[in-house]
């Protein structure tokens, strides 16, 4: 197993390049001759009110015994607004691809799918209490990934949640 990271941190910008992998693990469960994953995380402060972030990764898994390989990847872009000391908003766009069934996100037919998601989160602070409402829309490349209330298949879904955090 090999883990590695190269980074650069400046006052208004940071970037991290990460690697995790192993080779020669033919008797592991699940069986894999090699697994390689590389990721990039970066953030930049554009002003006192705005910042941007990126997080992306790709993973390749090779199985010599079964003579197959899998691959998946994902990317997320974050746009942050700090409106005041007590309130902020984050818009996150994510896309992940599982065309070679690497993370086992498949539709009802067993085919790998790609998903785009957009999330908007608020962050409201009062003393030690933080309220975080979030709304998310997901859209998949297959209409067989999500299930409607009536049991029918659909390619999109939405979620609303509220988190409450108290810090000691």
Where do the language-model regions lie?
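Internal mixed-charge
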Residues: 2
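Outer-membrane beta-barrel pore domains
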Residues: 8, 13-23, 29-168
């Amino acid at each position: 197993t090999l883990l590695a990271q190269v980074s650069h941190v400046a006052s208004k910008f940071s970037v991290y390049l990460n690697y995790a992998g192993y080779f020669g693990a033919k008797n592991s469960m699940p069986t894999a001759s090699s697994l390689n994953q590389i990721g990039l995380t970066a953030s930049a402060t554009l002003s006192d009110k705005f910042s941007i972030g990126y997080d992306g990764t790709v993973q390749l898994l090779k199985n010599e015994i079964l003579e197959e390989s899998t691959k998946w990847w994902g990317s997320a872009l974050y746009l942050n607004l700090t409106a005041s000391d007590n309130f902020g908003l984050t818009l996150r766009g994510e896309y992940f691809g599982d065309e070679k069934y690497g993370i086992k996100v498949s539709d009802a037919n067993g085919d790998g799918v790609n998903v785009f998601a957009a999330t908007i989160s608020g962050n409201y602070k009062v003393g030690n209490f933080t309220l975080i409402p979030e709304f998310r829309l997901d859209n998949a490349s297959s209409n067989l990934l999500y299930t409607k209330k009536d049991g029918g298949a659909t390619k999109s879904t939405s979620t609303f949640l509220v988190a409450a955090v108290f810090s000691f």
